[in-house]
A protein has these predicted regions:
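Zn2+-dependent metallopeptidase catalytic core
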Residues: 90, 341-365
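Bacterial N-terminal signal peptides
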Residues: 10-21
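The catalytic-center signature of Zn2+-dependent metalloproteases
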Residues: 370-393, 455-512
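Bacterial N-terminal signal peptides that target proteins for export
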Residues: 1-12
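Auxiliary tRNA-acceptor-end handling modules of aminoacyl-tRNA synthetases
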Residues: 28-338, 356, 360, 371-426, ...
Length: 849
């Protein structure tokens, strides 16, 4: 069961770019084959005679040849590169993985363009064609029919012809006639998306056509299961947009890359697959199966996981419940360029998963090692697709990501290159300082000591490794923890503040200084849910087919999900339990504690970040992070309004899948916003800080106020609330009641007769402009003078056919009456002008001329 949603929002930090290497394109782009050198297109000689056929082996692979045996035997003859393809490999599936080995300067675009980045992935087959040809076909597994004895199999095959992406003349046959020799030189030298950049990447990197005269083959090496091609490629480069905050425009010209292409033989013995379950969740490989449903088609999702198999001699031990070592453990190598002081922490972050795999019955199933030196292993290469690695990248990107490469036929994870960007440490410093410094004195300074930073690196390492094991984010894990337990020193230090390291619940910001909670209760760790998810995904179910084990896994899952700590919640922007950067089972209560800590931190920042001889950039950076944290707290509350709980179930499980968030919680969220946002947060406007980091401006607070108002009054949210009330008029929050409560909060001065400050007047105008925009959608409701971001999840709504415009007009009529009644008694001139202005705007909307 899948829930579809749309969203409009800025990207969230540390949200890895997982999807770049999660799936093989179902519609690969065609490659234009070379037209010379390899004889890849038939040619004629004047009188129409065709090119000569294969020559004797020794005439092609001469005594000058430098030969390398392996998966594909490679021969270099002068400036030609010949591939010798055994007949036994024809028709076999190969996975081609392309990476940047060395990147040009000043070309990176966000997360893309660094050494180690994957830039392409394809499944191909070599096959023998007519007229002494070898073809490369690009293979898609988007449709599937397993049983070749059924008529449906033939029908699917007729409608699923795989494209021929390249063709080569057979230059010679192997000495023993069991293989074919082709000239691969021109194909490597060409620009094609089988071996190099997929078209998707080029616009991001601003690169265009290949500069052939500035490109060449560096080397080709072959190993038992893979062949590695290393090239230098130069592309034309267009100038880029101005770099934000500067006058610098990246220049045009050329960009030169060192690229590596790995051609890997996929297993003939397919891994035992496991079907996806929404209640646990893994990354998936998907296809349409025409055999699974006799009365239709069925979309199949298989989880992606490593092939961990029991040694035959250990099967009896496993059945007795003893831990066994897998045939092939999961090994990650640490990039040799990684600063030495961080290597132990990165290794520990990997090894921390060993306990989780013990739940699946395996010991020593996963480990990290330092990459071997040239003296230890001259064949080891970071770009070699046989090896998984944590790749250290000299980047300003404050992030890390954990993609993986998998076999699209079964979901078997083959390798992973975790991207570790150097500047992630700045982000860790900022977040730990603003979330944990009230409890950890070591966080109250500009530069953390190595032990603290190392522990932060360790937890991010574990998080990214989790992605490479197949685990997505479990944003709802922390919602299983009662808020007050986050302040219980003994409990939280034992259990952690979230049961999953795959949650975005960085640090325990609920803990107060007086709680005296140590780092054991502040830092994320691999928790109960992670142990369960690894058990579910990796524990072998012996002597069962994929279909048969589904019933067994279902019984496991039904029992386990009775424990809220073992629950997976999908992030959909509508379920308030599954949000990023939040803690506890009630975000309003948790975030009140978080705000209390921010109020404690703010006045101390100038002292903590006082660096002799330095300017105030560090202070500005951390202050802006405080504002960002405050913004997160506000939007956590917003999600409760019109929120829907989603709990995926199978048909035999009791309870509903979709449940409206109780009205009492929605009202609590609105009260939280009224108190902490719509009433001016003067504590955040610390003059001692602001006078040092910026000219006077109101945008920091105003933009949050306006964006929250826009999200609360979005047609998507109001439309969803209308539908919720129609389904459940007991628990739902009716939109007229909600809008009236919001109006009373924002316009309370009409009753109290108190004067308004500039921030409060802004909020009131924002409310009115948002209401006007519901009536007249063309009205620009942004009141900040800049970009107004409205985050909304769900289907679009036609205002004219719902109660939304009716409620908006009714609210403005009532408000206009109240404003006109208040004007005569208003003594403050600015407040009076403000009320007169707003009254005019409402009147113009309700009574257009």
């Amino acid at each position: 069961m899948r829930k579809l949603f749309t969203w409009q929002a800025a990207g969230l930090l540390l949200m890895p770019l997982l999807f770049l290497s999660q799936s093989i394109s179902a519609q690969p782009k065609p490659v234009t084959p070379p037209t010379n050198g390899t004889g890849t297109t038939p040619t004629t000689n004047g009188g129409g005679s065709t090119k000569p056929g294969p020559k004797p082996y020794k005439e092609v692979i001469t005594e000058k040849a430098q030969s390398r045996s392996g998966l594909l035997t490679v021969h270099k003859v002068e400036d030609k590169w010949y591939f010798e393809i055994g007949d036994s490999l024809l028709g076999r599936d190969f996975l081609v993985v392309n990476r940047i080995a060395k990147a040009p300067v000043d070309l990176q675009s966000g997360f893309i363009g660094y050494a180690g980045d994957e830039i392409g992935e394809n499944v191909i087959r070599f096959e023998k064609g007519p007229n002494n040809k070898i073809f490369i076909r690009t293979i898609s597994y988007s449709v599937y029919a397993k049983d070749s004895t059924k008529p449906m199999y033939k029908s699917v095959m007729r409608s699923s012809v795989q494209p021929i992406s390249a063709a080569f003349d057979i230059k010679a046959f192997s000495k023993d006639s069991t293989g074919s020799v082709i000239d691969f030189t021109d194909y490597i030298n060409s620009d094609n998306d089988i071996l190099f950049f997929e078209g998707f990447f080029k616009p991001f990197l601003r690169i265009g056509s290949l500069q052939s005269d500035k490109s060449y083959i560096l080397d080709v090496k072959s190993y038992p299961m893979n062949t590695e091609i290393k090239t230098v490629k130069t592309y034309s480069k267009s100038s880029g947009p101005t770099v934000p905050g500067t006058f610098f425009i990246p220049p045009s010209g050329n960009a030169t890359f060192e690229l590596n292409s790995s051609i890997i033989l996929l297993p003939k013995n397919l891994m035992h697959s496991r079907y996806y379950d929404d209640r646990v969740a893994y990354f998936t490989t998907e296809f349409t199966d025409f055999d699974a449903d006799p009365q239709g088609v069925k979309d199949i999702s298989l989880i992606t996981r490593w092939r961990l198999e029991i040694k035959p001699e250990d099967t009896a031990k496993f059945k007795r419940g003893e831990l066994v070592e897998p045939i092939k453990p999961i090994v990650y190598y640490i990039d040799p360029t990684t600063p030495k002081k961080w290597v132990p922490y990165l290794i520990q972050g990997v090894n921390d998963w060993q306990k989780a795999f013990e739940k699946a019955g395996f010991k020593n199933a996963i480990m990290a090692k330092e990459a071997p030196t040239k003296e230890e292993d001259s064949t080891w290469s970071l770009e070699d697709a046989r090896y998984s690695a944590i790749v250290y990248k000299p980047s300003t990107v404050a992030n890390a990501s954990g993609p993986h490469v998998h076999d699209p036929r079964t979901g078997e994870i083959l390798e992973s290159h975790i991207n570790w960007y150097h500047n992630v440490m700045r982000l860790l410093r900022d977040w730990y300082l603003i979330q944990a410094s009230p409890s950890d004195p070591a966080a109250r300074k500009a530069q953390f000591d190595d032990e603290l930073m190392g522990q932060l690196i360790r937890l991010v390492s574990s998080h990214e490794v989790g992605h490479t094991l197949g685990l997505p984010h479990n944003m709802g894990a922390s919602a299983s923890v009662p808020v007050e337990k986050l302040r219980d020193k003994a409990w939280v230090e034992t259990n952690g503040h979230t049961p999953s390291i795959m949650d975005y619940a960085r640090f325990n910001y609920v803990a107060q200084p007086e709680d005296k909670i140590s780092r054991d209760g502040l830092l994320m760790r691999i928790g109960d849910y992670d142990y369960w998810s690894i058990e579910w995904g990796y524990k072998p179910v012996l002597d069962k087919t994929e279909e048969q084990e589904k019933a067994i896994l279902n019984e496991w899952t039904k029992e386990k999900v009775k424990n809220p700590r073992l629950r997976f919640l999908h992030y959909d922007g509508v379920d308030p339990r599954a949000q990023t950067e939040c803690l506890g089972d009630n975000n309003m209560k948790a975030n009140e504690y978080g705000l209390k800590n921010l109020k404690w931190i703010i006045p101390q920042l100038p002292d903590w970040l006082n660096e002799k001889g330095e300017n105030f950039d560090n202070l500005a950076d951390v202050y802006n992070e405080v504002v960002g944290q405050y913004n997160r707290y506000m939007f956590h509350a917003v999600t409760y309004v019109g929120g829907i709980y989603t709990d995926y179930k199978t048909t035999e499980q009791p309870g509903n899948v979709y449940t409206v968030v109780p009205k009492a919680l929605q009202k609590e969220a609105l009260n939280f916003l009224s108190k902490n946002l719509f009433e001016t947060p003067y504590w955040l406007l610390n003059k001692n800080i602001l006078d040092k980091i910026s000219t006077p401006q109101m945008d920091r607070i105003n933009s949050i106020q306006d964006n929250v108002m826009g999200s609360l009054l979005s047609t998507t949210r109001l439309g969803r609330m209308t539908a919720e009330y129609n389904r459940d008029n007991v628990n739902a929050y009716r939109i007229d009641e909600f809008v009236d409560d919001l109006k009373k909060s924002v316009w309370s001065e009409l009753v109290t007769k108190k004067p308004t400050d500039a921030y409060r007047r802004f909020v009131q105008k924002s409310f009115v402009e948002r209401m006007i925009s519901l009536i007249n959608p063309s009205n620009n409701a942004s009141g900040t003078g800049g970009i107004s971001i409205v985050i909304s999840f769900g289907p679009t709504v036609d205002n004219k056919k719902t109660d939304i415009i009716s409620v908006a007009k009714g609210t403005l009529r009532s408000l206009l009456t109240d404003i006109r009644a208040a004007i005569p008694a208003t003594s403050d001139k600015l407040t009076r002008y403000h009320l007169q202005d707003v009254a005019d705007r409402i009147d113009k909307t309700l009574n257009p001329k």
